[in-house]
Structure formats: structure tokens, C-alpha cells
Swiss-Prot record:
The gene is add. SUPFAM superfamilies: Metallo-dependent hydrolases. InterPro entries: A_deaminase, A_deaminase_dom, Ado/ade_deaminase, Metal_Hydrolase. The active site is at 200 (proton donor). GO terms for biological process: adenosine catabolic process; hypoxanthine salvage; inosine biosynthetic process; nucleotide metabolic process; purine ribonucleoside monophosphate biosynthetic process. Its cofactor is Zn(2+). This is Adenosine deaminase. Keywords: Hydrolase, Metal-binding, Nucleotide metabolism, Zinc. Binds 1 zinc ion per subunit. Its EC number is 3.5.4.4. It catalyses: adenosine + H2O + H(+) = inosine + NH4(+); 2'-deoxyadenosine + H2O + H(+) = 2'-deoxyinosine + NH4(+). Zn(2+) binds at residues 12, 14, 197, 278. Catalyzes the hydrolytic deamination of adenosine and 2-deoxyadenosine.
């Protein structure tokens, strides 16, 4: 259950994993692309999860049609703008929208720096028009290797003053964190914060690596942390947040069932964990679903959900004054 008098945040929300089916159809036709289907319901199983996928990589393939229709920078701008509208429609007060410009640019050879600028423009316009607050997190897609990630980081850093953090996402097993230590030295030099997808497809060691070698202050998913009690204690003691995505973890087969999800164990250890969507359009869910449907399946109590909602603002990459402004706004509702 969502408490209206508290700010609602979504800190782990992929902009390029949230492209509307209608937009995929519209842009596909605009650019004359061969789509697997040409009406919404026939296209849905190609771009949205209809049952759990066998792996993270299989899940990620559902995102491919969304970025395949990004035929020019205006399309990127449109998708970014629509993402802000979707967040508003989901009752979200503050969203951190993350995106991989290399992945968005890849199909149509768009300039990476141009994609970054288009996304910034689209999100800023959306925030003006829809009256919600959003910030951007740039992703390096480890799936494509070290060189591609360097190109991606170079593009992201052209707009570093418009970003709050850098993330490492993609094939965690095939491209481990130690390959990207030099990339994150540059992130530190740029004075950007770090969140890393870790402990999703690989084990607790991947999370230690993200924290100790890459400088992560938040971890995306992190479900494998429960295999290492010392890591759990470290997360709690050092205030390292876990961006939890319940439905996503089921759909990627990262976790076998809602009942076995480790989010309750995080809370028991005093780890700051928050609730997020991940890829809403691909999953066919929104943030209220996670609070009202997924969380009760996990067995979270109303008091635990309240703490999770509070954690979402505490962990946000915002200044204390920005957080306080959101608290005051929500308290008046």
C-alpha cells in the first residue's frame, strides 16, 4: 500500500526499457521498419513478458524492439518525454531514469553524445510539462565490452552536469566488474555517484567488487547478498542501498518465487532497500503494482512497506533540501 503523505520514488527505472507499445508501432511505421507484428496485441508478446524468461539475457532481448525503432534523435527525445509522463501517471513524485545511449544509438548508428543530449532535452521538457521531478543516470552497457563502454562514457560525460550518477548494467556474468575499474575512475573524477547492477545474475562477490572496486553507493537488485552474511552487515553498516525490483526478479528467473524473494531479509538486517519497477513497459507493470500486488505476495507488512517508501527518498541522489521539499509537498496531500 502506498502512503500518499510520503513521497513516492522510483530509483531503478530504465528509460530504454519503458518504451510504449504504441510508440514502437508508430515509430516502426514512421521509419519503414519490419516489425514482428503491426497491431498492439499481436506485437505485445514480442516486446512484453508474458511468462517468466529463463534468464536475464532472455529477458533483456524483449527490450530490443523498443530501441530498434529509435531511427533519429527526435525519436529518442520523444521516448524520454513519454517516460516522464508515464512516471506522472504512475503517481511517482521523483524518478531516476537510467538509460544506455550506446544501446539506444546502436541500431541506427546515431551519435552517442547526440542521444544523450536528446534524452536530457526530452526529460527536461517532460518535467516542465508534467510537474514531476526526475533525474538521469547514465548506463554503461557491459554486454558490449570495455571499448563500447568507454565510447558510452565519453558520450555521457558531455552532459555530466545533467546526470546524477553512472550505472553498469547488462551481462554481469560474462562481463564482470573488474573489467571496468578504469571507467569508474573517470566517473569519480567527474564527481558523479555510482550505482551498479550486481548480485542479480552473479553472486555476492560481484557486489563486493561493485562496492570496493567501482565505488558503488547503491546496488541494483543485489538479491545474492543474502548468500554472504558479512556483506549484509556491511550494506547495513555503510548505508549502501539496495534497489529492489520484485516483479523483474521473478520475470528474469533471478528469484524463483515472490515468497522466496530476499527483500524481507534485507529489512531484517537493517539494509536500506527501496521498491522500483526496472523496465515497466517490458514487464507490463507500474510502481503501484509493486506496492499493491507484488509486495503482499512477498509477505511485506504495511509497516515494512512504509519503511521501504521512506527508504526510497533517503536513497535518492538528491540534496537534503530537495528531499525536504518533496516531503513537505507530499505531507500536504
Amino acid at each position: 500500500m502506498i502512503i500518499k503523505q510520503l513521497p513516492l520514488t522510483d530509483l531503478h527505472r530504465h528509460l530504454d526499457g519503458n518504451i510504449r507499445i504504441e510508440t514502437i508501432l508508430d515509430l516502426g511505421q514512421k521509419f519503414g521498419l519490419d516489425l514482428p507484428a503491426y497491431d498492439i496485441e499481436a506485437l505485445r508478446p514480442h516486446v512484453q513478458i508474458v511468462e517468466a524468461e529463463p534468464s536475464l539475457v532472455a529477458f533483456l532481448s524483449k527490450l530490443d524492439w523498443g530501441v530498434a525503432v529509435l531511427g533519429d534523435l527526435d525519436a529518442c527525445r520523444r521516448v524520454a518525454y513519454e517516460n516522464v509522463q508515464d512516471a506522472m501517471n504512475a503517481q511517482i513524485d521523483y524518478a531516476e531514469l537510467r538509460f544506455s545511449p550506446y544501446y539506444m544509438a546502436m541500431k541506427h548508428n546515431l551519435p552517442i553524445a547526440g542521444v544523450v543530449e536528446a534524452v536530457v532535452d526530452g526529460v527536461e521538457a517532460g518535467c516542465r510539462d508534467f510537474g514531476i521531478k526526475a533525474n538521469l543516470i547514465g548506463i554503461m552497457s557491459r554486454t558490449f565490452g570495455q571499448d563500447a563502454c568507454q565510447q558510452e562514457l565519453d558520450g555521457l560525460l558531455t552532459q555530466k552536469h545533467k546526470l546524477v550518477a553512472i550505472d553498469l548494467a547488462g551481462d554481469e556474468l560474462g562481463q564482470p566488474g573488474d573489467l571496468f575499474v578504469n571507467h569508474f575512475k573517470q566517473v569519480k573524477d567527474a564527481d558523479l555517484r555510482v550505482t551498479v547492477h550486481a548480485g542479480e545474475a552473479a553472486g555476492a562477490a560481484s557486489m563486493w567488487q561493485a562496492i570496493n572496486e567501482l565505488g558503488a553507493v547503491r546496488i541494483g537488485h543485489g538479491v545474492k547478498a543474502i548468500e554472504d552474511p558479512k556483506l549484509m552487515e556491511y550494506l547495513a553498516k555503510n548505508n549502501i542501498g539496495i534497489e529492489s525490483c520484485l516483479t523483474s526478479n521473478i520475470q528474469t528467473s533471478t528469484v524463483a518465487s515472490f515468497e522466496s524473494h530476499p527483500i524481507k531479509t534485507f529489512l531484517d538486517y537493517g539494509v536500506k532497500v527501496c521498491l522500483n519497477t526496472d523496465d515497466p513497459a517490458v514487464e507490463g507493470i507500474e510502481l503501484p503494482h509493486e506496492y499493491e500486488v507484488a509486495a503482499p505476495k512477498v509477505g511485506l507488512t504495511p509497516e515494512q512497506l512504509k519503511q521501504i517508501q521512506i527508504n526510497g527518498l533517503d536513497l535518492a541522489f538528491l540534496s537534503d533540501s530537495e528531499k525536504q521539499a518533496l516531503r513537505e509537498m507530499a505531507a500536504k496531500r
